[in-house]
Amino acid sequence: MDPGDDWLVESLRLYQDFYAFDLSGATRVLEWIDDKGVFVAGYESLKKNEILHLKLPLRLSVKENKGLFPERDFKVRHGGFSDRSIFDLKHVPHTRLLVTSGLPGCYLQVWQVAEDSDVIKAVSTIAVHEKEESLWPRVAVFSTLAPGVLHGARLRSLQVVDLESRKTTYTSDVSDSEELSSLQVLDADTFAFCCASGRLGLVDTRQKWAPLENRSPGPGSGGERWCAEVGSWGQGPGPSIASLGSDGRLCLLDPRDLCHPVSSVQCPVSVPSPDPELLRVTWAPGLKNCLAISGFDGTVQVYDATSWDGTRSQDGTRSQVEPLFTHRGHIFLDGNGMDPAPLVTTHTWHPCRPRTLLSATNDASLHVWDWVDLCAPR
């Protein structure tokens, strides 16, 4: 039997729900608006790129399966066009505003999702201090009463801008030229940064720049690029920061001690990430100690980190771990099992359905999948 046919048969056992869609263009953005819709945006250069607000199939908008539903496809609720490639998009909570970043990275763009039509239109821009041809500002949003946009391409250019007044309310005010890979707002006063080098920091915006940080991810990190995500912030002690290297190294850290990883493991990736800009690690919002990684090939790997505390082999090297689940649908459905297989550009967890993820690839496919934990007791 053809490998693709084998996978289709096996998928009946592997998935509770599975949907495959074709977008008009590849996306690096999957941004939730409530639990029923997502934004996607194209990132091709030298062309207009679509920004779309997609409504999920009705079956995925309910917490329990209650029979058959007629709608089995995404519906386009709103749309617009950007003259730039879009590498990041953030929805400003409790508003109809979006903030996008991409190349050329000389400014951020603010968009409004219309109430009385299906249009997403550009309404303003936010100036960027650091203007470099090859770098684009990372973006995060403080969802306070007066929303603030955190952005920067390097540590020295980090700042928070009030979205309404456009006044700068916080700056790093340092000369450090480290390149950023990700920014994440944790609460009304705190954000996390990850540098491409693996340097991590937690910043309190009520104080001058004095981050709680590590300076590097540890031995063996030369030449790697890194990304990170903080999960379950403020919910007690424990390893709530996951840091992923382009060679498949995955570190879990406790925010109270960023210099000493709680565990350091090696994920089974066949080759280093071909495009470290696409590296992604995410914590499952509805499953304890569960996370997913992508950006190495056409798969998304899901891990249970419950037993990883202190994980190292006797000679001090990192131990290899095996995923709890691997989504290979993009390879067999979109790539037909052929090389080069599609590359996953991003993934995200559904905010309410514990085992449901969305994933997209560079061939413009979008999958929604609810995986079955085959190791769980029946």
UniProtKB/Swiss-Prot annotation:
It comes from the Eukaryota. WD repeats lie at residues 73-113, 121-163, 167-205, 214-255, 266-305, 322-371. Changing residue 96 to K: In GAMOS1; does not affect interaction with INTS9 and INTS11. Changing residue 8 to E: Abolished interaction with INTS9 and INTS11. Expressed in kidney and brain. In the kidney, expressed in glomeruli, most probably in podocytes, and in tubules (at protein level). In the brain, expressed in the cerebellum, with high levels in Purkinje cells and their projecting axons, in the deep cerebellar nuclei and in pyramidal neurons of the cerebral cortex (at protein level). In the white matter, mainly present in astrocytes, but not in oligodendrocytes (at protein level). Also highly expressed in endothelial cells of cerebral capillaries (at protein level). Keywords: Cytoplasm, Cytoskeleton, Disease variant, Epilepsy, Intellectual disability, Repeat, WD repeat. InterPro entries: WD40/YVTN_repeat-like_dom_sf, WD40_repeat_dom_sf, WD40_rpt, Wdr73. The keyword Cytoplasm applies. GO terms for biological process: cytoplasmic microtubule organization; nucleus organization. Its main location: cytoplasm. GO terms for molecular function: protein-macromolecule adaptor activity. Component of a multiprotein complex required for the assembly of the RNA endonuclease module of the integrator complex. Associates with INTS9 and INTS11 in the cytoplasm, stabilizing the INTS9-INTS11 heterodimer and blocking the active site of INTS11. BRAT1 then joins the complex and plugs the active site of INTS11, leading to WDR73 release and nuclear import of INTS9 and INTS11. Interacts with INTS9 and INTS11; the interaction is direct. Part of the multiprotein complex composed of BRAT1, WDR73, as well as integrator complex subunits INTS9 and INTS11. It is linked to Galloway-Mowat syndrome 1: A form of Galloway-Mowat syndrome, a severe renal-neurological disease characterized by early-onset nephrotic syndrome associated with microcephaly, central nervous system abnormalities, developmental delays, and a propensity for seizures. Brain anomalies include gyration defects ranging from lissencephaly to pachygyria and polymicrogyria, and cerebellar hypoplasia. Most patients show facial dysmorphism characterized by a small, narrow forehead, large/floppy ears, deep-set eyes, hypertelorism and micrognathia. Belongs to the WD repeat WDR73 family. This is Integrator complex assembly factor WDR73. It comes from Homo sapiens (Human). The lineage of its organism: Eukaryota, Metazoa, Chordata, Craniata, Vertebrata. The gene is WDR73.
